[in-house]
Structure formats: structure tokens, C-alpha cells
A protein has these predicted regions:
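Short glycine/threonine-rich turn/loop motifs
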Residues: 24-144, 207-309, 313-317, 322-327, ...
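C-terminal motif of bacterial Sec signal peptides marking the signal peptidase cleavage site
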Residues: 17-18
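Short, conserved catalytic or interaction motifs in soluble domains
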Residues: 21
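Generic hydrophobic, aliphatic-rich segments that mediate packing or membrane embedding
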Residues: 83-86, 115, 134, 155, ...
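C-terminal capping alpha-helices of c-type cytochrome domains
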Residues: 156-175, 179, 183-204, 297, ...
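Bacterial N-terminal signal peptides that target proteins for export
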Residues: 1-8
Length: 370
């Protein structure tokens, strides 16, 4: 074999080997996120007139990117097992962050026991969250719906995997919390982001109620609304008893009470034990958090189980003092002994409508980013 033929033979053999060799798999995608800049920008909440500064946890300061991540997670059904529901399903902006249902159904169309509470000003709440106060703070609260079998019916291990594999979330978690790798995306960071977004759900200060109580706005209550305000706050001989539970800038005192919804033979007789399920204290059975009255006209139906469809029905309940049980709130007994008249109910109703904050429910920063 001469040199030319030998050269051709070797070249042919190399080409055959190259074509038949098993190709090497591509390098796996990098878990690292360090090539993405982390430059957190602090976000400052400006409270409306009459509101104090919000207390923010030291381990979860508000940042622009943290809030943006929380907003996406809030409106993303990725948190549910079948990707059909999310936080937004029970907390719609049009209903002041409620769903306007007596009770809410999860992904399996199983109804829960209670109405969704409004998230308006939830960052100011203390003494527990939910109707029964079972979560200490927003970070703890955000973890519960995902694994609740009646709500999103997912588990956080799966959610963490979905978030790590997502096309956008690793970058967003990096920008929000400075993590170095996708594997560092955790449920706790997701809960922190959700809590940051929820802390931005604050009143605008532009309701008629707020403007009428702020000097220099030129807004005044009507005569009927003024009478309702007097009854609400016991500024006259008659006391509507409203301001005892629905007081301060939040229009709630964050206390759990039995407001005489059900009559029971003994304190074990409540179908829904409310606060008692959390504390295991018999005297807490049948007690529920006093909700805020801000945007109350937008959050029907009312009470923890949505039993009252209208505010008129609510006032009728309070006008009669409700039903007796051993731990009924003393205020209800006073109402029973001194019931509201029809003109008094109408005046209080007029005042309640001044608490509607249309600026809040039209805030574009609180809408879905998708």
C-alpha cells in the first residue's frame, strides 16, 4: 500500500469512528444563579393619614423585587396541585381581597367551613390571623393553604420543585433574596415573598369616611351619616355598640368574641368551635375574630360562615342581641336589652357605606401581573 492509499484509508477510518461514536450528552443546566445581579431596593410603605407605620419583621424587609415575586406567586395557580387555583381564588381585589362566597371551594370542589377574610390592611393585624387566629403572622399564614386538602391540596416539596424548574422564578428568587442556586428556593422564601406583597394591601385613605375625618379635605358626612357616626362611637346617649369591637384606624380591635350567632346548651355545642379549636379553652368555643369594617359593603356575605347576605341582615341580628350562650359577649346582652331602632340602623348603615375605599380595589399595583 503506497503512502496515498494509506492516508486515505486512515482518514476513512477516522470518519467512520466519528460517525458511529455515541455522542456525549450536553452539559446539565447550571444550578448556579450567581451570574444574575442581586441589588435589592428597599420598598417603603407610606401609610394614609391616621395610620401608624407598619411593623415589618427584621428578617423579611420589604424590597421591590420581593414584592414583585410575591405578587406573581399570589396570582399563579402553580401553588395548587392541578394548577387551577391560587391565593387569588379566595382573595379577589374587586371584593376587597375576599371571594364574596359564604364558604370557598378548593381544587377538588370541596367546600370549606368558613368565609375568606379580607386581606385589606392585613399587615397591621396582630393577635393571630384567620378567623380563629391559628397563624401567628403572615409568613406562617402563607404556608397553610398550599397543603390544606380542602384548598390547594398540594405539598410544599412539589411546589419547591416546580418553582426551581420554572423558566422565570429562579431569577426572581435570586433578585428578591440573593440566593446563589436554584436549590435554595424554599417554601419559607416563597412565604416571605407572599407576605411582602400582602403587606402592601393597605387602605388608600380616600374613602369618604377617611376624608371626612381628615382636616382640610372639605369632605363632610351627611346628616344621616353623622348620626350614624355618633351612634357608632357613643357620642350621644344612645350607643350602637359598634365602636367597642370595630375601633381605631383598622376598624377592628383584633379580639375574638362570641357575637351571639348560635344558641347552644353548653359550650361544647358549637358546630364550629372557632378560637377554641386553637386554644383548647372551653370558654373560647364559638369565638371568632372581629373583622375590619373597612370596605365592608364590598365583602358580603357576612360572618365567619357567610350566613348573612346583606348588611341589613347583620344590623337586624345586632338589633335583637342574637342568641344566648354562656360565653356570649356582654355587648350583645346590652343590645338585647336596648335594641336599635329602624332609623338608628339606617344611620349606621349609611356610615358603613362611607367606609368603602374604591381607590384600593382599583389599585393597579395589586392586580394580576399575568
Amino acid at each position: 500500500m503506497n503512502f496515498s492509499n494509506r492516508y486515505i484509508y486512515i482518514l476513512f477510518a477516522v470518519l467512520v469512528y466519528a460517525c458511529t461514536k455515541t455522542p456525549m450528552p450536553p452539559d446539565p443546566p447550571s444550578d448556579s444563579l450567581t451570574d444574575i445581579p442581586y441589588n435589592p431596593v428597599a420598598y417603603t410603605i407610606t401609610p394614609p393619614p391616621g395610620f401608624p407605620a407598619m411593623s415589618i419583621p427584621a428578617d423579611n424587609p420589604l424590597t421591590v423585587d420581593g414584592i414583585a415575586l410575591g405578587r406573581h406567586l399570589f396570582y399563579d395557580p402553580i401553588l395548587s396541585a392541578d394548577s387551577t387555583k391560587g391565593c387569588f381564588s379566595c382573595h379577589a381585589l374587586s371584593g376587597s381581597m375576599t371571594d364574596n362566597l359564604a364558604v370557598s371551594a378548593g381544587i377538588d370542589n370541596i367546600n370549606g367551613r368558613r368565609s375568606s377574610m379580607s386581606l385589606l390592611n392585613v399587615g397591621y393585624y396582630y393577635n393571630g390571623l384567620f378567623w380563629d387566629g391559628r397563624s401567628e403572622n403572615l409568613e406562617a399564614q402563607a404556608l397553610k393553604p398550599v397543603e390544606d386538602p380542602i384548598e390547594l391540596h398540594e405539598n410544599w416539596d412539589n411546589v419547591e420543585v416546580k418553582l426551581r424548574r420554572h423558566v422565570s422564578y429562579p431569577t426572581m428568587f435570586r433578585k428578591a433574596f440573593g440566593i446563589s442556586a436554584k436549590s435554595e428556593i424554599t417554601r419559607d422564601l416563597a412565604a416571605k415573598a407572599l407576605a411582602q406583597f400582602e403587606r402592601t394591601m393597605i387602605s388608600s385613605g380616600k374613602s369618604k369616611y377617611d376624608l371626612a375625618l381628615t382636616t382640610g379635605t372639605g369632605v363632610e358626612f351627611s346628616d344621616e351619616e353623622s348620626y350614624g357616626f355618633s351612634l357608632y362611637n357613643q357620642l350621644e346617649t344612645r350607643d350602637g355598640q359598634c365602636g367597642h369591637c370595630h375601633q381605631g384606624f383598622l376598624l377592628t380591635d383584633n379580639v375574638y368574641r362570641n357575637n351571639a350567632l348560635d344558641e347552644v346548651a353548653d359550650l361544647n355545642g358549637f358546630v364550629d368551635k372557632g378560637r377554641g379549636e386553637v386554644t383548647n379553652i372551653l370558654y373560647d368555643n364559638g369565638k371568632f375574630r372581629a373583622p375590619t369594617l373597612r370596605n365592608i359593603a364590598l365583602t358580603a356575605p357576612y360572618m365567619h360562615d357567610g350566613r348573612f347576605l346583606t348588611l341589613e341582615q347583620v344590623l337586624d341580628h345586632y338589633a335583637t342581641g342574637g342568641h344566648y350562650s354562656d360565653n356570649v359577649d356582654p355587648i350583645m346582652i346590652q343590645l338585647k336589652n336596648n335594641p336599635l331602632t329602624e332609623p338608628e340602623k339606617q344611620a349606621i348603615l349609611a356610615l358603613l357605606h362611607t367606609m368603602t375605599d374604591t381607590v384600593f380595589v382599583n389599585n393597579p399595583a395589586l392586580t394580576s401581573p399575568f
